[in-house]
Regions:
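Glycine-enriched alpha-helix->loop->beta-strand junction motifs that scaffold or abut catalytic
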Residues: 231-236, 262-264, 290-292, 534-540, ...
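Bacterial N-terminal signal peptides that target proteins for export
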Residues: 2-14
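Boundary at the C-terminal end of the N-terminal hydrophobic targeting segment
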Residues: 26-30
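Bacterial N-terminal signal peptides
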Residues: 13-22
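Active-site neighborhood of phospho(di)ester-bond hydrolases with catalytic His/Asp-centered motifs
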Residues: 205, 238, 266-270, 513, ...
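Substrate-binding cleft of secreted/luminal carbohydrate-active enzymes
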Residues: 267, 271-347, 562-618, 837-887
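Substrate-binding surface in catalytic domains of secreted glycosidases
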Residues: 243-257, 545-552, 818-826
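Active-site mouth of glycoside hydrolases
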Residues: 32-233, 261, 275, 303, ...
């Protein structure tokens, strides 16, 4: 830029011109001119305490979000920002495009600022071009070019209230050979911004070395260099993905560290990672105490693959989601999380606030039902580990039971941790060899006489030791074994234990089991001891010798969660209807145990217009894994079923393409054939997935298509023989008419839902994966932070818009595949971003690869599959899902 002296008159003209530019964005009383410089007439110093307070008061608490990208090309960036605003966010932080071209960068900021402002949001741009300059060999030249770009950007946006702060450098090196020079560059950048009269907060993400011990340590080396530069900033800016560290001591120690540097507003510009327990609830509760502004990371499951932690790949199953607020269909990962954002406010006087989250955050119903994707748990109940090992060995061969609930002797564990752990590990090994999982019962009522903090630490340590162990089915934190004396004291102690136990990130559900006696009834609006225990649990457990049908029905109605019964003496009416998992203390008849299977769960389904909520879709799939065959017509399916004639099959479902032309020719014959198919399938223990339409009928009238769908679904709306409905298979695979295709999607879904069908409704889009380039690693390309996914999909004669539209309207997510396992896995990784049960309605096994490779993906990702052609029967019979287990 030019630095030669101008005449006083010329400077005045420029000053007035720029002042009017500033006034277009802010009020006159907001402008503070402190410069006496002729070269930089707008120069200002670091903000004073009063200016910081005015900034915070004007904008209020920042409820920000990082990089709210759309899930795929079917949604625009503006639409994604609008979604973020609807969740309660009021600011956007991101890395504008443009690189080292100042004009392009300015254009990108203008565009995003315009979108954000339209929805009542501010923006916080990051100078993402820093590394491009710093990586150049000629640092003197690079620094000059950087100065030109920074000054031009700041001048352009001077006075723009849409921008709330500038983040000069995101996460410079913590402590290496480059740290010192990076700090020198940032110091210069602060000066340039001040000289250009930057009216927004100047800050930089220098503090990103979190951890309680780090925050408490004295500053030295690279940390001292960074903290000295931090003193130059208008507001403090830090990153922390470990807010739960030290039982939520991380935030107060970080707060103390920053306030020691200088007393300024604090913004945590990156936070929220669920897999280590740094959830919305835990994080924002403590931020509110300490008046901390925030930006969580990620809006929806999308191509950057932020659903999994650093270095992990979305090619494999995951839960919980690492970053992001929403699934790809823009449904919340957890329905409670948007409320934490919308309701966020500073608490002001936090001097006496306790550290730690007062809120005990439980699993969402969706996650609880997703965990149960293996069918019924039929278990044994034991009071000692020794008894459990004996029973496991007794039933190792008969395969009647698949889990065992066992009391852990707290006294033994407390007195001899090593010996107790050895015994417990022996049980886990024995159970694994018998094909059984374990439900440890950590505490019983008599243990509550011990110190509550000691009990809480014990529960935390136990779960933390085995959090990643797939042999654990669930954790019973407390089994109530006798009457409760002081209820208020009991509730307080229980909450303390659960609160600390949940700091151990668990892959398995936690629950309490109240003793159900006469008069105890589930009611989510009540806070008696039993209902409080259920409200604090991921799944609903209870201890009783039996349970009435009324009790079980109320449990499901009020809590919508899987049910675990401990210590039952019989299998009573209503248990199968309400999907009760149990662990018996009695010697039940073998036939009763063998025949215990969940009945299909039907609701009143009063809502005849909306897609199923996610938890309901997962609850529907609370059954043994679907192992199916695909048939292109009813006659071939009937022939197979007649050949079986009740002799048994390794398959438990079939997908059958129905003949719409046959329906139009003779409805009587059509329904007679369909009824014959359903009857034969039921006689062989097989469910049916009908495919109603395909592109063969694309040119038929809308009336003809909807009348057909309405007639078929109405007739079988409550039929337990139907697994699900595929309304249209591979739409636009050969026909290209986007307008008509969209109309078909909307009309058929509307018609199908109006029938009140009790089974999940979906369509299968035409979607596959383009050929990978030579040497391409699909697993590595889906690692956290790698921008890849939807761009490699192909849609036949359709489009990404049609595929996305279909999956957003479907109760379950379905695709077909004839590609090898790596391609199928890639496609499935995109489908899994919708957070719903996955179906492969037609799997054509490629001749170039053994089916076992794809079967491994089906096991890991919990996919219901239908093979086009028979497979090895033993492989099919042994097919089962692997529990989702996520490391910290």
């Amino acid at each position: 830029m030019k630095t030669s002296r101008f005449s006083n008159r010329c400077r005045i003209v420029l000053f007035v011109s720029a002042l009017f530019s500033v006034l277009s964005f802010c009020r006159a009383e907001d402008i503070v001119l402190t410069s006496t410089s002729a070269t930089y007439p707008y120069e200002r110093g670091q903000w004073t305490a009063e200016q910081c307070a005015a900034w915070q008061e004007e904008y209020g608490p920042i409820r920000g979000i990082n990089c709210p990208y759309p899930p795929c090309g079917a949604m625009t960036q503006e639409q994604a920002i609008a979604y973020a605003a609807s969740l309660g966010y009021n600011s956007v932080r991101w890395w504008p495009s443009g690189g080292t071209n100042a004009d392009d960068y300015i254009k990108a900021v203008e565009q995003w600022a315009g979108w954000a402002d339209k929805y009542g949001m501010t923006v916080s741009p990051v100078f993402g071009f820093l590394q491009s300059y710093f990586s150049q060999s000629d640092h003197a030249s690079a620094l000059k070019n950087l100065e030109n770009q920074v000054r031009k950007i700041i001048r352009h946006f001077r006075g723009d209230k849409r921008i709330i702060l500038w983040d000069l450098w995101n996460e410079p090196n913590l402590n290496d050979d480059d740290t010192k020079e990076m700090m020198e560059w940032i110091t210069k950048m602060v000066t340039w911004c001040q000289q250009e009269g930057c009216t927004q907060a100047i800050t930089s993400s220098l503090i990103w070395d979190g951890g309680v011990s780090t925050n408490q340590a004295a500053a030295s080396g690279g940390r001292l260099l960074r903290e000295n530069v931090e003193k130059l900033m208008d507001v403090h800016n830090y990153h922390d993905y470990s807010c739960q560290d030290g039982f939520n001591n991380e935030t107060p120690t970080m707060y103390a560290r920053l306030k020691k540097i200088s007393d300024r507003p604090i913004v945590c510009t990156e936070c929220m990672t669920r897999t280590n327990g740094s959830t919305y609830a835990r994080t924002l509760i403590d931020f509110a105490k300490y008046n901390i502004n925030f930006y969580t990371w990620g809006l929806s499951a999308c191509d950057p693959n932020w659903e999994v932690r650093w270095s992990r790949s979305t090619f494999y199953n995951w839960d919980p989601m690492f970053h992001n607020a929403l699934y790809a269909d823009m449904e919340p990962y957890n329905e409670s999380e948007p409320q934490w954002v919308k309701n966020y406010q500073f608490q002001g006087d936090f001097g006496g606030a306790k550290t730690g989250a007062e809120y005990t955050e439980i699993w969402s119903s969706r996650r609880a039902w997703k965990w149960m994707q293996h069918g019924e748990s039929k278990g044994l109940y034991c009071k000692t580990i020794a008894e459990a090992i004996t029973k496991v060995n007794t039933h190792k061969r008969d395969k009647l039971y698949n889990t065992i609930a066992v009391r852990i002797n707290y006294a033994s564990w407390a007195s001899s941790n090593s010996a107790a752990k050895t015994q417990f590990n022996s049980l886990l090994s024995a159970a694994e060899s018998a094909g059984m999982t374990v439900i440890p019962i950590l505490l019983t009522s008599e243990n509550l006489r011990s110190n509550v903090n000691t009990l809480a630490t014990y529960a935390f340590n136990f779960i933390n030791e085995y959090y990643y162990d797939r042999r654990i089915q669930a954790w019973c934190i407390l089994e109530q074994t006798d009457a409760i004396g002081n209820e208020e004291n009991f509730k307080s102690n229980l909450e303390t234990i659960l609160r600390k136990a949940r700091y151990a990130f668990q892959n398995q559900p936690l629950f309490c089991a109240p003793l159900v006696t006469e008069g105890v009834m589930p009611d989510s609006t009540q806070t008696d001891v039993a209902n409080l225990m259920w409200q604090l649990s991921d799944v609903c457990g209870f201890s009783a010798s039996d349970a009435s049908m009324e009790f079980l029905g109320r449990m499901m109605k009020h809590y919508h969660r899987p049910i675990f019964l401990l210590g039952n003496n019989s299998l009573t009416e209503g248990m199968q209807d309400n999907h009760v998992n149990w662990a018996t203390a009695a010697a039940l008849p073998s036939e009763d145990v063998s025949n215990y299977h969940f009945n299909i769960f039907f609701d009143n389904n009063e809502d005849r217009s909306s897609r199923w909520p996610g938890w309901k879709a997962w609850r529907w799939m609370n059954r043994p894994p679907t192992r199916g065959l695909f048939f292109s017509n009813i006659s071939s399916a009937i022939s197979m079923l007649e050949e079986l004639n009740g002799t048994g099959s390794p398959y438990n479902s079939i997908c059958v393409a129905l003949d719409f032309r046959g329906y139009r020719s003779s409805q009587e014959t059509f329904f007679a054939d369909l009824e014959n198919l359903l009857s034969l399938a039921a006689a062989n223990g097989i469910t049916v997935l009908p495919q109603l339409l395909s592109d063969t009928y694309f040119r038929m009238s809308a009336y003809a298509l909807t009348e057909y769908v309405e007639n078929v679904l109405t007739r079988y709306a409550n039929d337990t023989r139907i697994l699900a409905w595929d309304l249209y298979n591979k739409l636009s695979s050969v026909n290209s008419n986007p307008t008509k295709a969209e109309s078909i999607i909307d009309d058929l879904f509307k018609t199908a839902r109006a029938t009140g069908a009790q089974q999940p409704i979906f369509m299968t889009p035409s979607v596959s994966v383009n050929t990978f380039p030579s040497g391409f690693d699909p697993i590595a390309s889906l690692v956290h932070g790698r921008y890849d996914g939807w761009s490699r999909l192909a849609y036949g004669s359709g489009s990404v818009d049609l595929c996305y539209r279909i999956w957003c309207m479907s109760d379950v997510i379905c695709y077909t595949s004839s590609q090898t396992s790596l391609y199928l896995g890639w496609l499935n990784a995109q489908a899994a971003k919708f957070g719903r049960p996955l179906f492969c309605a037609e799997w054509k096994v490629p001749t170039s690869e053994a089916p076992s490779s794809t079967m491994e993906i089906f096991k890991d990702m919990h996919i219901s599959w239908f093979a086009n052609g028979t497979l090895d029967e033993e492989m099919v019979r042994e097919f089962t899902y692997r529990p989702v287990s996520t490391q910290h």
